[in-house]
């Protein structure tokens, strides 16, 4: 396990690999970071918290900050794409990803992390914002099966990974079931990604680990230990897509850094947003 970014953050989250770079955010600091393979780094600061980011087909990065979606073309060119008007002040945005059609799926979480006031939402290609799931406390990791027939989803306090049937054309989910219960592991599931074999990689917040889960056998088949207990998210990247980039939170001398680990499987490319 290698520490690749030595600037200590408060809550690094939401890593993506796009444009041959690693992007990630520091949620409470309102920072978007870009780290290239040669170590070159730049950052953009927003006046409010940021939570997720995704690349877009027209170039640049879409960032969820406050109650809006922003397009970052470069560090000096930022514009508001969409603002959620009827915002529930009990919540904030959390993890989000785009599906293969380019829709932006974004979850919300209860600010007190206690009550099921959050949900899962979709910003469609026609810029309509809709709710697809209610009664969520801390909406977190999202990943689609390789055939796009299923959505895997985390509501962290449940300590479970859920599986939904996914309709790619309509952008709808149905038939929720529990894929796996992780209650025997320390911590709660947080961010999540999928590899080229269709298995999930899940960050354990408070558990100091990333778990690899076989979705067919519904069991953990690998565990990567980290020096920091609060592991927040994970993504594949690098020139061969076989490097796992892992973000952590600052509650420990080794927390609040970004780590990497070469693994024996490749990831899949991040879907790009369609707006």
Curated annotation (Swiss-Prot):
Pfam families: SGL (PF08450). It comes from the Archaea. GO terms for biological process: L-ascorbic acid biosynthetic process. One of its GO terms (molecular function) is gluconolactonase activity. InterPro entries: 6-blade_b-propeller_TolB-like, SGL, SMP-30. Belongs to the SMP-30/CGR1 family. This is Uncharacterized protein Saci_1674. It comes from Sulfolobus acidocaldarius (strain ATCC 33909 / DSM 639 / JCM 8929 / NBRC 15157 / NCIMB 11770).
